[in-house]
Amino acid sequence: MAKTALIQKANSKPKFGVRAYTRCNRCGRPRSVYRKFGLCRICLREMALAGQLPGVTKSSW
């Protein structure tokens, strides 16, 4: 889990727009966040496999 202080810092509006960055809405992870879902790759996989994300299916070919 991410530190609460860092999550609060990311939620506040930065002085300059370039400093803004995305965090996972579920766990607060700063890396590999999918903008479309607002989730990191780990949370996205967990929720997709549990069937909590409508329209997302496991790929097979």
Curated annotation (Swiss-Prot):
GO CC, one annotated term: small ribosomal subunit
Residues that bind Zn(2+): C24, C27, C40, C43
Keyword Kinase included in the entry's annotation: no
InterPro entries reported in the protein's UniProt record: Ribosomal_uS14 (IPR001209), Ribosomal_uS14_bact (IPR023053), Ribosomal_uS14_CS (IPR018271), Ribosomal_uS14_sf (IPR043140)
Keywords of this entry: Metal-binding, Ribonucleoprotein, Ribosomal protein, RNA-binding, rRNA-binding, Zinc
Protein's UniProt keywords contain Zinc: yes
Cofactor: record remark: Binds 1 zinc ion per subunit.
Stored PROSITE patterns: RIBOSOMAL_S14
Cofactor section: Zn(2+)
GO BP annotations listed: translation
GO MF assignments: rRNA binding; structural constituent of ribosome; zinc ion binding
Family classification: Belongs to the universal ribosomal protein uS14 family. Zinc-binding uS14 subfamily.
Quaternary state and interactors: Part of the 30S ribosomal subunit. Contacts proteins S3 and S10.
Functional note: Binds 16S rRNA, required for the assembly of 30S particles and may also be responsible for determining the conformation of the 16S rRNA at the A site.
Name the UniProt record assigns to this protein: Small ribosomal subunit protein uS14
Originating organism: Beutenbergia cavernae (strain ATCC BAA-8 / DSM 12333 / CCUG 43141 / JCM 11478 / NBRC 16432 / NCIMB 13614 / HKI 0122)
